[in-house]
């Protein structure tokens, strides 16, 4: 019997770390992405950024706006590659309706948290979020610093 390949590394392609700091996460969803061939090759090379990215629901479809996938030099020689084009998210109708209704509420939006591989498919973890106030951000940072300090103390003893 042939052995299965182990996990050769992390399946995460890109993370939106800023989103976890700037927003309260209410609910998360998993969506597929509709990509071109050169984009998949670039994602395998880890050339993706999710900072300042958001999700727009238009005409019953979900779109990923502001994401940046840098094309490789060896790929897309005959196709003009647009690194920041809008990409379609593949979700169920009920999920799209839920996201649309929640984003209509004041102070709510939908942002991607990370891109990752699931078998051989690219998936996007997205979340319905509410913006944090400045004092919430300070409290989050203070709690994170205290947890780090506790870990240092525990390691020392």
From Swiss-Prot:
GO terms for biological process: trans-translation. It comes from Chromohalobacter salexigens (strain ATCC BAA-138 / DSM 3043 / CIP 106854 / NCIMB 13768 / 1H11). This is SsrA-binding protein. InterPro entries: SmpB (IPR023620), SsrA-bd_prot (IPR000037), SsrA-bd_prot_CS (IPR020081). CDD domains: SmpB (cd09294). GO terms for cellular component: cytosol. Keywords: Cytoplasm, RNA-binding. Required for rescue of stalled ribosomes mediated by trans-translation. Binds to transfer-messenger RNA (tmRNA), required for stable association of tmRNA with ribosomes. tmRNA and SmpB together mimic tRNA shape, replacing the anticodon stem-loop with SmpB. tmRNA is encoded by the ssrA gene; the 2 termini fold to resemble tRNA(Ala) and it encodes a 'tag peptide', a short internal open reading frame. During trans-translation Ala-aminoacylated tmRNA acts like a tRNA, entering the A-site of stalled ribosomes, displacing the stalled mRNA. Belongs to the SmpB family. It is found in: Cytoplasm. One of its GO terms (molecular function) is RNA binding.
